Regions:
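N-terminal helix-turn-helix/winged-helix DNA-binding helices
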Residues: 1-2, 41-74, 78-80, 88-89, ...
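N-terminal helix-turn-helix DNA-binding module of bacterial transcription factors
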Residues: 1-59
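Short beta-strand elements in bilobed, periplasmic/extracellular small-molecule ligand-binding domains
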Residues: 86-97, 201-224
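Flexible loop/hinge segments that line or gate small-molecule binding clefts
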Residues: 92, 100, 122-168, 189, ...
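Periplasmic-binding protein-like
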Residues: 109, 116-124, 182-184, 237-247, ...
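Hydrophobic alpha-helical segments within soluble ligand-binding/sensing domains
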Residues: 158-183, 195-202, 223-232, 251, ...
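An alpha-beta-alpha
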Residues: 169-207, 214, 317-331
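Flexible loop/turn connectors
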Residues: 229-339
Length: 339
């Protein structure tokens, strides 16, 4: 019966490289992997089953991930970073959608644990402020939480600096000459929505600009929410010269509503979004926004989780990634004599 050593000799690589290719425990170039797989096939080599290996080493090389179902492509862009990083590290990914349902979320977590995943990545807004008994029953399972908080269970956390991002957005509008600046927030029970709004308020306070309650509306981070929020602002009276819309999906809804109502973006109203989702540059006008490093969020989550799985660190970590401004065409400079 052929061995890994035989495959290594035929493929012209080391035995450890053969092991990594067969067990998918490390990224190996496509050319070398093809040579190894071809040699294994030629020698009729059969690898031990994944189940047998996992029972032997108490590892499945599988990560579970829970995501809140949303029409927002932000989640898909983050998952792409997670999936690609898992592949490069030789891990499989099991992805579960919670659809915002608390019971489904708990059921999915239990299912993933029963499948003996090595660790969990959670990106569920419904987890915020929750205490989950399942993590008390499985205290040793490594968990990384992405982009939400605070949590009532111990976990590492990867998040965007939303306070800084909200400040950047409002401060940019101010630097462009705007003094009447409204805000469409996300759901303010959510930490990230709170922080973006706080950043907006901090920028206005620093420059001594007033808050007009008629220009501040809470919405839901979805297109429809932005659409309805803008109509509420219009119904309350004169518009501000600029709006900070706290994510790009809501900004898309605002642009749609503005077009229906004959409000020209950006000449009648400047808009800045948040997230820099892929379609932001294809909106009309292309959306000025705050870039979240979405791929890097996913990558950092995998790297942090693997450190916990491999027991490289025991301390709970909070890793904060910094947002940046992306200038496009939905904001124009404002002059006091403009109407």
């Amino acid at each position: 019966m052929a061995t890994m050593k035989d495959i290594a000799k035929l493929a012209g690589v080391s035995t450890s490289t053969v092991s990594h290719v067969i067990n998918k425990t490390r990224f190996v170039s496509e050319e070398i992997a093809e040579r190894v797989n071809h040699a294994a096939k030629e020698l009729n080599y059969f690898a031990p089953s994944a189940l047998a290996r996992s029972l032997k080493v108490n590892r499945t090389n599988t990560i579970g991930m829970l995501v809140t179902t949303s029409t927002n492509p932000f989640f898909g862009e983050v998952v792409k970073g997670v999936e690609r990083s898992c592949y490069q590290k030789g891990y499989n990914l099991i992805l579960c959608n919670t659809e915002g349902d608390h019971e489904r979320m708990k059921s999915s977590i239990m299912t993933l644990l029963q499948k003996r995943v090595d660790g969990l990545i959670l990106m569920c807004s419904s987890l915020e402020g929750e205490r989950l008994d399942v993590f008390e029953r499985y205290p040793d399972i490594p968990v990384v939480v992405m982009d939400w908080g605070p949590m009532l269970f111990s976990s590492d956390k990867i998040q965007d600096n939303s306070l800084r991002g909200g400040y950047l957005a409002a401060n940019y509008l101010i630097q462009m000459g705007h003094k009447e600046i409204g805000c469409i927030t996300g759901p303010l029970i959510k930490y990230q929505a709170q922080m973006r709004y706080e950043g907006y308020k901090r920028a206005l306070n620093e420059h001594g600009l007033p808050f007009n309650p008629a220009w501040i509306v809470e919405a839901d981070f979805e297109c429809e929410g932005g659409y309805q929020a803008f109509k509420k602002i219009v119904a309350k009276g004169p518009l501000p010269s600029a709006l900070f819309v706290c994510n790009d999906m809501m900004a898309m809804g605002v642009i749609n509503a503005a077009n229906e109502l004959g409000v020209e973006i950006p000449h009648d109203l400047s808009i800045i979004g948040y997230d820099d989702i892929h379609i932001a540059k294809f909106m009309t006008p292309s959306l000025t926004t705050i870039h979240q490093p979405k791929y890097r969020l996913g990558q950092a989550a995998v790297e942090t989780l693997l450190k916990k799985i491999n027991k490289e660190t025991a301390e709970v970590q909070v890793i904060q990634l910094e947002p940046t401004l992306i200038e496009r065409n939905s904001v124009v400079e404002w002059h006091d004599n403009e109407i």
